[in-house]
Every structure is written in structure tokens, then in C-alpha cells.
């Protein structure tokens, strides 16, 4: 006999151990002969990471598919692994060194520091895998990969060298997102916009001597200028005055009539003295500010593009750590005549932190009368998500991938339907990103990561090879082949050769996303031709969040299509489907963040409710394209769903339903059993199709309805007289049928609730119900049974009883009161059903007797069931007048509250200023009140008709 209650805390580790000891999730286990493969690669979590709700949703959905396909007999591989997370890991280890008062990264040197990181990884990295196991993730854990593993590193080197030699990787000087704290380039996804209360400084840039223009200062109601003033300066606005030191132009729109006469003229840059041109460009908006925009091509992405078009110089005035550098800066000093009057200002600014320099520059401009005005300005400032400080667009030389060329086959793969996005609307986002793709900056100024396989000769010549030996060989061939001073220099070095004398390796490492882009094939052994690569590539579906479609999904497609070919040489996509799941938000629909204090820890939920309850909640709420609003109360509700199944199993055991030996579904004789077998087959079909179509919420919903409503609430309830009766044949059939259906339920629910179902599968074994495999290896049920007549009959009975119960509840009939039931207009089939199920109707609907009549009795509530009308004469059971009055008062109360909420929601100030969760709560309350009013209105109509 099952324990009275299910203890998830005790069961989950026991089941996890059983799976582990059985090697239950090894690739190919449980596969049928010549089975087709089903492959998923896990989005590799950071080695520094811990499980969050996004991981929980993402991996729950993957696990549902993996367990489903494994039970269907496919050759399944769910490939696990971790990302080395360059910046995050380096920061964690550096912080640990500081906390332990050990030598810093710089003090210990590169080799010792990297060794220290590997030690940290062995001690503390990979915590998230144990957390994923607690969630029930059925990966092939024996195949765990790490992006810095030897094999994966070999793949990274091979790809870099190949792309470089094809001209698809190159060095270039461009603007990058630069983190002055970490002193490295970072990717867009590592940039977090933060709203700050700043200022907009409107600065006056003097026109060169003798140049003036007429600037409008008054306008009529149609916006036409009526007054002008002569100006010898332009007003430009900026939120970053410190960058003005690098200004090399002022842009105005070519159609802006205010400035037509001075395009091509120059302004004199304050503090610097540089003569910079006024250029006409489409970028400035004439309706914003003065319409004149200062151009700092070395410190702003938009200005960089304008500068390229207009031929403006690029002057970098910030060091790697965000300090002003001008006095020994050749780019800054070029073309300046070094007026002594400015040297004092330069001395004050040299070496100052950017924000300190901002204050000094504003002071200097105010002293010179060149600050037109200052206004408060709330705006978004990009910050590095790791360093936590404002990032700087910075002009540096970096390594780039020609993403535009690699993107073309990926775009074609989606357009031609070889890779599909689910939901499909994400394809539009994919195309927008890919068709406007920029060169991909792949170098990072870090130590932890894949060091770029590039070496520099004494003259700066680049040699990109798989290792230093190959690079040295290439360098020698290069220099010896060309007559000149370098040939003699290298020949001299070779006579007394010492490692490192001829070549110097690039110190940068690759962007973490570079190695992640190879994940679908590097984890299978590429560039070696392994059996796993041949069998499991192409993978089937990638499950991901929308935020990394560009950073990861698109890049995997670019790399996969470039490097993976079939036997005919045709490029092969890394996956045929990309399933994009939504965000997990809090119960009020707010994005979870530490600053809001609304982060929900999935491990705490597992501790409290069990992994199965969390998984089922996430699945049933995972509607395509709709964010998950996670309320712990919902998880508690779905824990109750598990309890319902547990109790149903106990009920079955107590009533002898412990074996399905000899049970043949097609031979079932009782209508109730034929009905549940039909509904079971319908559920099998619905669940299977929904999982195949990535409609996880519909699959979970179908299971919930079948298990809770049809099986527990109706089937077991309708069987009670059979279990307690004297018809032994009917009892034996029903006991066997119940055991059979329960086994099928365990199988169907297993992908969603693996721990409880595996426990039930084990605990219900016995003679005639032997378990030859773990449930996770049991065969997925087949939808083969159909008896529409039985289904129609029992569903008719359910509709009738449910209708009577609803009327009783709506009209406030006391639960113990027995009501008469009068049937009007029943045809022969309905009359036969009434006779067959009379005892069930009386017991379940609290009906005293059933009569037939030609007209509905006066004072009765009526329910239409099929062609007949079921009438409940309630005048003798309730005071119809008092009930009518009660309902009218309830409706009036609802109306008052509805009007109050409608008034608040119509108030623009409330909607604009109240906390979003409060506004959302009021909207949800309004929906509840509308539903209440509808129900009360139906009840009032029934009472009025009955009276």
C-alpha cells in the first residue's frame, strides 16, 4: 500500500539515484532497432551560474521533449555542457584572490592566473548541473562538455584559422563597447541600459572669424520664423561634455534652412582650438534641439558612421581606464598650433577620470561664456552588466568576423523553411537583425578564454596558425623569401634561436560567444569525424529565450552552415527548429530583477513544492508567445494535482485495482470502462500532437483535464457502486481497467512530472503488473481505442449532472436538499440512458426522483441537455423571492466596485503614475468582476424564470 502522503523531499533524491545507477539517460538507451535520432543541445549555462527561473523553464521544456521521444523509442541525445563565461569567471576568481588577500591577477601573471581559474572550476564550477538534476533534467551526463575542454578548444582554433585564411576574420579599427573598469571590449548583450537623472548641456561653439548667420528666435502659430538674430556661434547639446575634446565636426541636416549658408564653414572647438567643419548629413533631426549635432567619431557609434560618410577625423581622447589623454596624444595634437593659452586647460584635464573631466570642462566653458543653458535630463546610460560602470564607445583595433557574408546562408535557410522558428513571428526579428548585421568583434582583453591563435613578427606581420610551431614555420618562410633587412634580421635570430624572439603571440582571447557558436558540432567531436557527429548532427530543436536569438542562435547557424556539410557537400543547418520560449515574470507580470526584490529562486520552490509541481506549472503556463506570470499559489495548486493522482492510486489499491493482468481494452464490456478508454486514447493523441507541435501548455492542460476531471472526479466516482457491488465480473473488469488506465497516466505524465510518476510506477508493481523497465524507458502509449457511443453516453451523463449541480449552486439550494428532476422532450435514447444511470444521477446530483412530463413544471429551473430539457422544480426548496433579492443585491455590489475600478483605469494620471503591478491588479480584478456579474446574471434569470 502506498504511503498516505507523497514526500517529494525524500522521493526525488532516491529516484535521481536510481536513474543515475541505471545510466538511464545515456545516448541511445531504450532506442528501437534502426531508430531515428532525436538530438538537443542544452544552451550551455555559465560555469559561474546558478539555476534561475529562465533555466527552469528552458530545461523543463527540453526535458519534456527528450523524455517523450526516449519513451517513443528514438535514439535520443540530450547534450549537456557549460560555457567558460570569460568575463564572469575572471571576475569571480579575481574577487576570490582579493578576499583571500592573495596576489592579484597582474601580480601572479597570466599562466599562474589561468591555472588558478582551472582550480576554481574544479572546486566550485558547475554547481548548476547538480541543480538541473534536482529539476529532473535527463541529459546524458556522461557526455558533459565545457567550452574550454581540449576537444572544443581544438574546434575553436580550427574555425578561427580557417576563417582567417578565407578572409572572413580580419583586424580592423572600429568603435566597440568598452568597459573602463574591466578594460575590455564587451558585446551588446553585456550592456545594460540604466536610467539616470543627468543633464543636457547646450554649448556654444564659436564660428571661425568673420562667419555669421541668421538664427530664428520667434515664430508665428504656424511655426514660421518672424524674428531672427545674427549669431557667430552654433549651439550643440550633449550629455557627455568630456567627449567634446575629440570633436571633429558639427553636422546639420541638408534641408535645414537655418544652416544652409554655413555648411562647409568651420567652428573653433573650445578648450582645444581645433578648426572643425560644418557638414550636411541626413543624421541630424532639424526638429530636435537646435538641429546642430557635435560629431565625436571616436566616442559615439552614430558619430562614427557620420564621420565615415563625411570623412571626419577620429580622435580618441580617453585611455583604457576612462581617463583623459591629450598632451602626448598624436591624434589629438595633429593640426593644432599649441597656443600657450590652452596649455593650462590641457594640464588640468590630463589624466583626469572622465566624470571629473566633465565637471572641469563645464566649469571652463562657463568661465568662457560658452554654456548657453543647462537642463535636467533623464536618460538611459549604457552600463557594463559585469563591471557596473557606464561603458564608453571606444576606438580600438580588434579582431572581427565578416558576419555579413556568413549571415547570407543563415537567412536563406530560414526563408526556405529549412530552419523554422516557433512561434513564427520571431523570424521577422531574426531577419531584421541578420539583414542589418555589422562586423562581429570577437576579441576580448581578458586572460581567461581561448587565446587568439595569432602571432606577430618583428615588423608586425601577422601569422595565424593552429600552434606556435606552425606559426614560426610560416614566419620563417615569409621572411626568408623576401630580400631586405628583415631577412637578415631573422636569419641572425635563427642562428641563436630562443623561443619568443621572432614571434609574439596576441594576448587577447576570443568572445565567449565564438566558442558557443560551435556548440552543436564541437560537442560531437568536430573537427574529428566521430561516430557521434555522423549520427547526431543535425540536431533537432533548439530551445532558447528570445534575448539570445542574435547572439547565439544566429551565430550557430552561421558557423554550422559554413563548416558542416553532407556527403554531397551541401551545407547542413545545426537544427531544423528553433523554439523560442517567453520570459518568466513575477505574478504581477513584472520582469524579475534583484533591484525590484521580486526574484524567485527555483530551488526554494522545489524545496517547498517539489520539482514536479514546478515543472508542471511552467509547462501548463508556457503558451507560445505569452510570458509566464509565476505565482507560487499556482505551484501549490499543481502540487495538489500530484496529490490527487497519488490519492487516486491509493483509492485504486484499496479497491483491489492492483493488476491489469489479462485485461484487453477491446474486450471491455462496461460502458463506463469503454468511455474512459476512449477518453484516454483521445488524451494520448492530444498530448502527443501538442508536444510534437511545441504546444506544451495544451499538452499539460489535456493531461490535467483527463486526470483530475475525467479519471478522478468522474470515472472513480462512477465506479464506487461497482467496487462495492456484488457483480464480480464487472468488478474484476473495472479493477483491471483502473490499473491499466493508471499505468497509462503514469506514462503520459512522466515527461512533465518524472519523479512522482517514477515512484508510483515502482510502488505499484506486483503480480500481473510487473515492471520490466524504469518508467522513463516504458513505451509511450498508443491511441488505438475508440467507442464513440460509450463516450457520448457518459459525457451526456456528466453534462446532465454538472448542469444540475451548477443550477443548485447558482440558486443557493442547500447541499443536503433532495430536488425532484422532471425531463421534458426526451427521445427513446435519452429515456434509456436515464433508466440506466438513474442511480448515479440521484446520488451525484442530489436528485430525489426522476419523472417525465410533456411541459416544464411551473417554478422550475431548466437545463437543456441534448434534445431534452431537465427541469428542477425548486419552489419547495428555496424562497424564490428572497433568492431573487439576494442576487440583485449581489449584482448591485459588483456594479459599484466595477464602476470604481473603471473610473480609476480611465484616470490617465493613475495609469501613468501608479506602480505597474497595481494597474495590472485592477485590470485583473475587473475581469473577475465581469465574470462574477455574468454568473450572477445567469442565476437571476433562472430564479426569475422559475418564479
From Swiss-Prot:
Q: What Pfam families does the database record attribute to this sequence?
A: Anticodon_1, tRNA-synt_1, Val_tRNA-synt_C
Q: Which CDD domains match?
A: Anticodon_Ia_Val (cd07962), ValRS_core (cd00817)
Which BP terms from GO are recorded? valyl-tRNA aminoacylation
Gene Ontology CC = cytosol
Task: State the span of motif ('KMSKS' region).
Answer: 591-595
In Gene Ontology terms, what is one molecular function of this protein?
A: aminoacyl-tRNA deacylase activity
| Catalysed reactions, semicolon-separated | tRNA(Val) + L-valine + ATP = L-valyl-tRNA(Val) + AMP + diphosphate
The record's HAMAP family line, in alphabetical order, gives: Val_tRNA_synth_type1
Domain free text: ValRS has two distinct active sites: one for aminoacylation and one for editing. The misactivated threonine is translocated from the active site to the editing site.
Designated name of the protein: Valine--tRNA ligase
Top-level taxonomy: Bacteria, Pseudomonadati, Pseudomonadota, Alphaproteobacteria, Hyphomicrobiales
Amino acid at each position: 500500500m502506498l504511503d498516505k502522503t507523497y514526500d517529494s523531499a525524500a522521493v526525488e533524491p532516491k529516484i535521481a539515484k536510481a536513474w543515475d545507477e541505471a545510466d538511464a539517460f545515456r545516448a541511445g538507451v531504450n532506442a528501437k532497432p534502426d531508430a531515428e535520432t532525436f538530438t538537443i543541445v542544452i544552451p550551455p549555462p555559465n560555469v559561474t551560474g546558478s539555476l534561475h527561473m529562465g533555466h527552469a523553464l528552458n530545461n523543463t521544456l527540453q526535458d519534456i521533449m527528450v523524455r517523450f521521444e526516449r519513451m517513443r523509442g528514438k535514439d535520443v541525445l540530450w547534450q549537456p555542457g557549460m560555457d567558460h563565461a570569460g568575463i564572469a569567471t575572471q571576475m569571480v576568481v579575481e574577487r576570490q584572490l582579493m578576499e583571500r588577500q592573495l596576489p592579484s591577477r597582474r601580480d601572479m601573471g597570466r599562466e599562474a592566473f589561468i591555472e588558478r581559474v582551472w582550480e576554481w572550476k574544479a572546486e566550485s564550477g558547475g554547481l548548476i548541473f547538480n541543480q538541473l538534476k534536482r529539476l529532473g533534467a535527463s541529459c546524458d551526463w556522461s557526455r558533459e562538455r565545457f567550452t574550454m575542454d581540449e576537444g572544443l578548444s581544438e574546434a575553436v582554433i580550427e574555425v578561427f584559422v580557417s576563417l582567417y585564411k578565407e578572409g572572413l576574420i580580419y583586424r580592423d579599427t572600429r568603435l566597440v563597447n568598452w568597459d573602463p573598469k574591466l578594460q575590455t571590449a564587451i558585446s551588446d548583450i553585456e550592456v545594460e541600459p540604466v536610467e539616470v537623472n543627468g543633464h543636457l548641456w547646450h554649448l556654444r561653439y564659436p564660428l571661425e572669424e568673420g562667419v555669421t548667420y541668421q538664427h530664428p528666435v520667434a515664430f508665428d502659430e504656424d511655426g514660421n520664423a518672424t524674428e531672427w538674430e545674427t549669431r557667430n556661434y552654433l549651439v550643440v547639446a550633449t550629455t557627455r561634455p568630456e567627449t567634446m575634446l575629440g570633436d571633429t565636426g558639427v553636422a546639420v541636416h541638408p534641408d535645414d534652412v537655418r544652416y544652409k549658408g554655413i555648411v562647409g564653414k568651420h567652428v573653433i572647438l573650445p578648450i582645444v582650438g581645433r578648426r572643425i567643419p560644418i557638414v550636411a548629413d541626413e543624421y541630424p533631426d532639424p526638429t530636435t534641439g537646435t538641429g546642430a549635432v557635435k560629431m565625436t567619431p571616436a566616442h559615439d557609434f552614430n558619430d562614427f558612421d557620420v564621420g565615415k560618410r563625411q570623412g571626419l577625423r577620429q580622435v580618441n581622447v580617453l585611455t583604457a581606464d576612462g581617463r583623459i589623454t591629450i598632451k602626448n596624444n598624436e591624434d589629438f595634437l595633429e593640426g593644432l598650433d599649441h597656443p600657450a593659452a590652452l596649455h593650462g586647460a590641457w594640464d588640468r584635464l590630463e589624466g583626469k577620470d572622465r566624470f571629473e573631466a566633465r565637471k572641469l570642462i563645464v566649469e571652463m566653458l562657463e568661465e568662457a561664456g560658452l554654456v548657453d543653458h543647462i537642463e535636467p535630463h533623464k536618460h538611459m546610460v549604457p552600463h557594463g552588466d559585469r563591471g557596473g560602470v557606464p561603458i564608453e564607445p571606444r576606438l580600438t583595433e580588434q579582431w572581427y568576423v565578416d558576419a555579413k557574408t556568413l549571415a547570407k546562408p543563415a537567412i536563406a535557410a530560414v526563408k526556405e523553411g529549412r530552419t523554422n522558428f516557433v512561434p513564427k513571428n520571431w523570424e521577422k526579428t531574426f531577419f531584421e537583425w541578420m539583414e542589418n548585421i555589422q562586423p562581429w568583434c570577437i576579441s576580448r582583453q581578458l586572460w581567461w578564454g581561448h587565446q587568439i591563435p595569432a602571432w606577430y613578427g618583428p615588423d608586425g606581420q601577422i601569422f595565424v596558425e593552429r600552434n606556435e610551431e606552425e606559426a614560426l614555420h610560416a614566419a620563417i618562410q615569409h621572411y626568408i623569401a623576401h630580400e631586405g633587412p628583415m631577412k637578415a634580421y631573422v636569419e641572425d635570430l635563427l642562428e641563436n634561436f630562443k623561443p619568443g624572439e621572432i614571434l609574439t603571440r596576441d594576448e587577447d582571447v576570443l568572445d565567449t560567444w565564438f566558442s558557443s557558436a560551435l556548440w552543436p558540432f564541437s560537442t560531437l567531436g568536430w573537427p574529428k569525424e566521430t561516430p557521434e557527429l555522423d549520427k547526431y548532427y543535425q540536431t533537432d530543436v533548439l530551445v532558447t529565450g528570445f534575448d539570445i536569438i542574435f547572439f547565439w542562435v544566429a551565430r550557430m547557424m552561421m558557423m554550422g552552415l559554413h563548416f558542416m556539410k553532407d556527403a554531397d557537400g551541401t551545407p547542413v543547418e545545426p537544427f531544423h527548429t528553433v523554439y523560442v520560449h517567453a520570459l518568466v515574470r513575477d505574478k504581477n507580470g513584472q520582469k524579475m530583477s534583484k533591484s525590484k526584490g521580486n526574484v524567485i529562486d527555483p530551488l526554494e520552490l522545489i524545496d517547498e513544492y517539489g520539482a514536479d509541481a514546478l515543472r508542471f506549472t511552467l509547462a501548463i503556463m508556457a503558451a507560445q508567445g505569452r510570458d509566464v506570470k509565476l505565482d507560487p499559489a499556482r505551484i501549490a495548486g499543481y502540487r495538489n494535482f500530484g496529490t490527487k493522482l497519488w490519492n487516486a492510486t491509493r483509492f485504486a489499491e484499496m479497491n483491489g485495482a492492483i493488476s491489469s493482468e489479462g485485461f484487453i481494452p477491446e474486450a471491455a464490456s462496461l460502458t463506463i470502462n469503454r468511455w474512459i478508454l476512449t477518453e484516454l486514447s483521445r488524451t494520448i493523441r492530444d498530448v502527443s500532437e501538442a508536444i510534437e507541435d511545441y504546444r506544451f501548455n495544451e499538452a499539460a492542460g489535456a493531461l490535467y483535464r483527463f486526470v483530475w476531471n475525467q479519471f478522478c472526479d468522474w470515472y472513480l466516482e462512477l465506479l464506487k457502486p461497482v467496487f462495492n457491488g456484488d457483480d464480480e465480473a464487472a468488478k474484476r473488469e473495472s479493477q483491471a481497467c483502473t490499473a491499466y488506465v493508471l499505468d497509462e497516466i503514469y506514462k503520459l505524465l512522466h515527461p512533465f512530472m518524472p519523479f512522482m510518476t517514477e515512484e508510483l510506477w515502482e510502488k505499484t508493481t506486483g503480480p500481473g503488473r510487473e515492471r520490466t523497465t524504469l518508467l522513463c524507458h516504458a513505451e509511450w502509449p498508443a491511441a488505438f481505442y475508440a467507442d464513440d457511443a460509450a463516450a457520448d453516453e457518459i459525457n451526456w451523463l456528466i453534462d446532465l449532472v454538472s448542469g444540475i449541480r451548477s443550477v443548485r449552486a447558482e440558486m443557493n439550494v442547500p447541499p443536503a436538499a433532495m430536488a425532484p428532476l422532471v425531463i421534458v422532450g426526451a427521445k427513446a435514447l435519452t429515456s434509456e440512458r436515464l433508466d440506466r444511470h438513474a442511480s448515479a444521477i440521484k446520488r451525484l446530483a442530489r436528485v430525489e426522483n426522476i419523472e417525465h412530463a410533456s411541459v416544464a413544471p411551473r417554478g422550475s429551473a431548466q437545463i437543456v441537455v441534448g434534445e431534452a430539457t431537465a427541469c428542477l422544480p425548486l419552489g419547495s426548496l428555496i424562497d424564490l423571492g428572497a433568492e431573487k433579492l439576494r442576487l440583485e443585491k449581489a449584482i448591485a455590489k459588483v456594479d459599484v466596485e466595477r464602476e470604481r475600478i473603471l473610473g480609476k483605469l480611465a484616470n490617465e494620471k493613475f495609469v501613468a503614475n501608479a506602480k505597474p503591478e497595481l494597474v495590472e491588479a485592477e485590470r485583473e480584478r475587473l475581469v473577475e468582476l465581469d465574470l462574477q456579474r455574468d454568473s450572477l446574471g445567469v442565476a437571476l434569470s433562472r430564479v426569475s424564470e422559475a418564479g
